[in-house]
Amino acid sequence: MHNDIRGLPITTDSATAAHAFDHAVDGYLSFRSDLGARVEALLAADPECGMAQILKGYLGMLAYSNQTLTMARTASATARGLMKHTTKREQAHGEALAVWIEGDAGKASAIWEEILRDHPLDILAFRLHHLNNFWYGRPDVMLATVRSVERHWADTIPGFNAILGCRAFAHEESGLYMEAEIAGREAIRRDPGDLWAAHAVAHVLEMTGRRREGIAWVETLQNGWDGCNNLKHHLWWHQAMYHLELGDMSRVLHLYDVRFRELDSPLTKAVPDLYIDVQNAISMLFRLTRHGVDVGDRWIELADKAETRTGDCQNPFTLPHWMMALAATGRETAARRMLEGMRDYAQAPGMNARIVGEVAIPISQAVLAHGLGQYEQAVGLMRPVLGEMSRLGGSHAQQDVLEQLFLDAALKAGLDDDRRLLIERVSGRHPVPPAHRRGYAMAA
């Protein structure tokens, strides 16, 4: 038995494995592109370490794809055979992984909360809880957990910066922008390469309409992101969003091609259809197209990838994005095939399947109807679930693309009541008035 760097027991006879565990967890906290290699080094140091197998399973789940779900299942099954003589905390991690694999992130979240009640320094449970609740639209839960855990931490404990970054983002998604910015900037002061803290402040600057500050924020910090994973693409997407609001469409296209959708970059080549990259690219192309910008053939590679993901519903928020790509390229047959795959998936038990059935399917149907020019139908499909969209996950800034689609359909269908409904909705969710936002000004 050894302890991790925060003093929590890890069931392994290998000091090398214990150090490798810390190195892998640090890679997860800091969004390192070599996280997979770190986990493999941990497994090589002690293949019988239950937490090593669980960490591999968590890594598979965090990619939100059917392909890596298979990897997670295998790791979970292996871990199950190794957990008999481990600690209750480690066994709870094994249970959380197992229920997450079965599509119930809500149960997994509850288990991580139980772990944190007894072990508030379990940074792995904390970050998994934070990100999962983000992807299921529960900022209130994110914030409550930050507040309950952070009092047990001190700035001398390894991983404290991750607590600050999560504090910043939980406050931002809860609309508490001043508190979010203070925490995020403090995290960056301590570690300028902290990607999650940089991301939280980028959200604050976007939501408060400080676009030129946002551009400077990203440009100042980006040289410290070498070795980081695809989250840096998302920061560059935020940079493009600032430029879009300022009307600099040529700069947006430049950032698309050389920053957040650079097809020849090693990160993109490694996983060409990673959910966050797909969301970045498709949502930006939709916005640009709506503003009359010629995006050339950029839709095609995304639609090609969409066709290979039929039935893959691990990340519900990605599904309407795939549908946008299929609709934009006129692939109605493939789009209907994807909808059928969603319907099949929605028959399964678990929280994820319910969200797909109750929210992702009607919104994806609306996206297709919009793409087919059936604007009144698109509004009718989407209107009943506008208030449920947060369950898909994604930030306020990310969900904006779906709100813009609804508004565009309402305007083109001449549905003035629905136009007003949407404008009132975004007015209550965003501190910048619609009249001062490029996607809404013409309808405000």
Annotate each predicted stretch with a short phrase.
Residues 145-246:
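Internal metal/ion-chelating core segments
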Residues 81-180:
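Well-ordered mid-protein domain cores that form the structural environment of catalytic cofactors
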Residues 8-10, 78-90, 117-119, 150-160, ...:
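Flexible helix-coil transition and linker loops at the boundaries of alpha-helical arrays
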